[in-house]
């Protein structure tokens, strides 16, 4: 799904290029058509992991506050988004997804809010669950 060279060139940590992530989100309908470009504009400059590039403004805007539980969102938001959308969100009960989606911190981060809301709605629809 993603290219083989999806690693930070400095630390070697795996990350997913945001352009590829954006196309994947678009193709899987996790982001609605009208939100697609807005979402890409938000992350298209955050190609390298925040640990190696802390001064990149795009990375800074994607790093969540430390008060946000790290098991929900490691610093690399693109990697976290892919993992959460493909595995834990799918396996987690709707109530758990709703708790994450409704968290106070998620409400202050537009990109995160968009990802969570579209992921939750899409998975509920595909699994035949209603809120």
From Swiss-Prot:
Induction entry: Induced by interferon alpha.
Organism superkingdom: Eukaryota
Cellular compartments per GO CC: endoplasmic reticulum
Protein name: Torsin-1A-interacting protein 2, isoform IFRG15
Source organism per UniProt: Mus musculus (Mouse)
